[in-house]
Amino acid sequence: MCIRDRFKTRQIGKPVRFVELAQEINNSMPAYVVSRIIERMNKLEKPMKNSKILIFGVAYKKDIRDTRESPALDIIENFNSKGVEISYYDPFVDSLIVDNKQVNKETSQENFEKYDMLLMHTPHSEFSSINFSKINVPIFDATGSEFIDDAERI
């Protein structure tokens, strides 16, 4: 649910239950994504502490640089608390600070295989040129993106 819709429902002055439910679901998704990745890592017998996860796209929406309200921030914060080493790959976001710490920006596709897990968070159009099938790292797709074939999905 976009910020504009929440703002408009507040202007009405009465609760709109459908909007409230959508917001509750949206708010719970970062924790859900983290829990699914933990399950996947457990199946692969990889401990979360000191694991390396690369997040593809940290912007709020596709093909923009705005990270305000992005669920990626909550995901990163959650992983940080578990001792996971987080990096991101995003052609639109030059730098990112979460928990008063600079998040490492991955700049080279040649480094993708050094990670334990890849998370597709914001499916920027530019990612369609990446051949994900040639990357020998498990992928969790939180977006249902059309350019990843072999990934665990929400």
Give the residues covered by each predicted segment:
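Structural/interface elements that position substrates and couple domains in central-metabolism enzymes
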Residues: 4-154
